[in-house]
A protein has these predicted regions:
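Tubulin/FtsZ superfamily GTPase core signature
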Residues: 1-209
Length: 209
């Protein structure tokens, strides 16, 4: 995770990503981009971004404009929005590191992110009684102002409590991927956690957008 537009993040992030990739790591970068009203910082960020993207398997652009828009929609302080970014990354790490009923691993992620085009991380959380609201939150969650319509690849993990049913998984997955390319490669996982009772969480890596 880095903030572009200043000195340290802009100067070091691309090199750190390059070194990590040299060691065989799967490199997932999340880059915060400055407001449009900050032309100098925007210029610095634009110069740094190509190096970071070239050395990352997935590079998620986080627009401060989009973050502020999300906050207005949710009627929250926009600075609290940084917590959403952490939730995105935490959700992905949990997906890959935890044992589930249907497991996902790094090979699954590599299969998805190797699709041509951009990629993004998506997360949505809500009540298990209203799975459609989870999908709606997930579709509105990207912080880099992209659309998942026509996406070519999707790795999706559904997390829930012991009350999660097969119908929850089917409804969430089918609804979420309905706007993607008909030939979209979809890899699905599922995980049960006692902490998620009464709730559902959808975590997805969407590529080829």
């Amino acid at each position: 995770m880095t903030g572009l537009g200043g000195g340290m993040g802009s100067g070091a992030s691309g090199e750190l990503a390059r070194m990590a990739k040299q060691f065989g790591c799967l490199v997932l970068s999340v880059a915060g981009l400055p407001f449009a009203e900050q032309p100098l910082r925007c210029s610095i960020a634009e110069e740094a971004l190509p190096s970071l993207e070239a050395n990352s398997d997935v590079c998620i652009r986080v627009s401060m404009e989009r973050l502020a828009w999300q906050s207005r929609r949710r009627k929250t302080n926009w600075m609290i929005g940084s917590g959403w970014i952490g939730e995105l990354v935490e959700g992905l790490v949990t997906t890959l590191a935890s044992v589930g009923r249907i497991n996902l691993d790094l090979m699954d992620m590599k299969a998805i992110i190797n699709k041509n085009g951009n990629a993004t991380l998506i997360v949505g959380t809500g009540s298990s009684e209203n799975p459609s609201s989870v999908v709606e939150m997930a579709r509105n969650s990207p912080l880099n102002d992209v659309t998942i319509e026509g996406a070519k690849g999707c790795m999706i993990q559904v997390e829930g409590g012991p009350d999660m049913t097969l119908s929850h998984l089917t409804e969430l997955t089918d609804t979420f991927v309905s706007q993607m390319d008909p030939d979209c490669q979809v890899i699905m996982g599922a995980r049960v956690s006692d902490e998620m009772i009464g709730k559902l969480r959808l975590v997805a890596v969407v590529s080829g957008i």
